[in-house]
Amino acid sequence: MKNNFYKHFLPSEIIDNFDLVKINELEDKEHIEMRIYLDEKLVYPDGYSDGELESRGFTKSVFISDFPIRDKKVILVIRRRKWRVKKTGNLIFRDLEIRESGTMYSKEFAAFLKKNSTIMQ
């Protein structure tokens, strides 16, 4: 998508490493959910070059909760790029940490919730 407005709302590691594919809104009786679809950019993993790897498409989508926008629940729908090492046939991925370990939250959203959980108690 050519419009760059989304860069004001998404975590920096998402902007740096993923391309925006589309945005959908899903509505039910209780809430509106915004799904932001992102595909990992075509960037080789560290230590590899063009001739050593072959792109093998994307992983299945992962759903990550992020900060709400204008009372809408935000879900980042992320597809990671898979690479095959030509010499060995092994599949590898870039080393990206886009969600908080042990959660389905973006790192920033998890830090916000953790910081503010003591305020709410």
PLM regions and their residue ranges:
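Short, positively charged, Gly/Tyr-enriched micro-motifs
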Residues: 64-121
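Residue-level signal for pocket-adjacent positions within structured domains
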Residues: 5, 59-62, 93
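General N-terminal targeting signals
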Residues: 18, 22-23, 51-53, 81, ...
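Short linear sequence motifs
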Residues: 2, 11, 37, 56, ...
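N-terminal alpha-helical interaction blocks
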Residues: 1-44
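N-terminal juxtadomain amphipathic helix
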Residues: 32, 37-84
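Generic detector of short, locally flexible boundary/turn motifs and exposed helical patches
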Residues: 1-4, 47-52, 90-92
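Compositionally biased, intrinsically disordered low-complexity regions enriched in proline and serine
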Residues: 7, 19, 45, 49, ...
